[in-house]
Amino acid sequence: MLCLPVFIILLLLASPAAPKSFETKVQSDLTRTDGNMETEENLGEVRKVYCCLGVRDDWCCAGQIQI
């Protein structure tokens, strides 16, 4: 008699309609944030830092490549 309510509760917890756990929500938020950071503006800034500060390439800093 007690097994049926326990089984139903476990079934509800394992169902896809159950709310997401905290870790899953954080992981999806971080994934969404990473996707939003890869805009052309942000990638252009990374290219500028790499070319002008990291490599010190005059050709790159002079704007010969499209940033």
Curated annotation (Swiss-Prot):
Coiled coil: none annotated. Contains 2 disulfide bonds that can be either 'C1-C3, C2-C4' or 'C1-C4, C2-C3', since these disulfide connectivities have been observed for conotoxins with cysteine framework V (for examples, see AC P0DQQ7 and AC P81755). Residues 1-19 form the signal peptide. GO terms for cellular component: extracellular region. The keyword tRNA-binding does not apply. It comes from the Eukaryota. It is found in: Secreted. GO terms for molecular function: toxin activity. Expressed by the venom duct. The keyword ATP-binding does not apply. Keywords: Cleavage on pair of basic residues, Disulfide bond, Secreted, Signal, Toxin. Residues 20-46 form a propeptide. Transmembrane segments: none annotated. Belongs to the conotoxin T superfamily. The cysteine framework is V (CC-CC). This is Conotoxin Lt5.9.
